[in-house]
């Protein structure tokens, strides 16, 4: 994935804000799917996986002591 190296270089706060943005976009996609107007159904899956990857990097930063709790 092309974003892995980019995510590794991001700070904890940047990762959290990116995750929150993607979660909001994912919710919008879910609502569009319910209404029935979704252009690319695979976009939901890829976004969900990207959120999971961000969660992994956030957790790694927390364990390394870089996260602000």
UniProtKB/Swiss-Prot annotation:
The keyword Ribosomal protein applies. GO terms for cellular component: ribonucleoprotein complex; ribosome. One of its GO terms (molecular function) is structural constituent of ribosome. It comes from Treponema denticola (strain ATCC 35405 / DSM 14222 / CIP 103919 / JCM 8153 / KCTC 15104). This is Large ribosomal subunit protein uL29. GO terms for biological process: translation. Belongs to the universal ribosomal protein uL29 family. Gene3D superfamilies: 1.10.287.310. The keyword Oxidoreductase does not apply.
